[in-house]
UniProtKB/Swiss-Prot annotation:
It comes from Thiobacillus denitrificans (strain ATCC 25259 / T1). The lineage of its organism: Bacteria, Pseudomonadati, Pseudomonadota, Betaproteobacteria, Nitrosomonadales. GO terms for cellular component: cytosolic large ribosomal subunit. PROSITE patterns: RIBOSOMAL_L19. This is Large ribosomal subunit protein bL19. GO terms for molecular function: structural constituent of ribosome. Gene3D superfamilies: 2.30.30.790. The keyword Ribosomal protein applies. GO terms for biological process: translation. The gene is rplS.
Amino acid sequence: MNIIEQLEQEEIARLGKTVPDFAPGDTVVVQVKVKEGNRERLQAYEGVVIAKRNRGLNSAFTVRKISAGEGVERTFQTYSPLVASVEVKRRGDVRRAKLYYLRERSGKSARIKEKLPARKASVAAE
């Protein structure tokens, strides 16, 4: 590990931010800090993760949602101070790392199958 990576790891540890494990296809709710005038509030942004960029301190993810019939995408820096929290609502079962093909789709074709938890072997044997 070179010195830059080491400094980034130290900075991530110093921030102490716990980010849940999520992957493209998952539906997440991102709580974003929004400043309006002199007051600050949290705004929820719920959508499907279509891309994830793992680069240590520079990690980012893109969330897509449909707002008033229009597709809206927003990219968040994972360790940004503006991102208060990330909550996984639903796990999606996809076979791609980047889901950019969802941009051209609408309606039922844009749906993502839900990933169901694996059944135990004892249940399958019965």
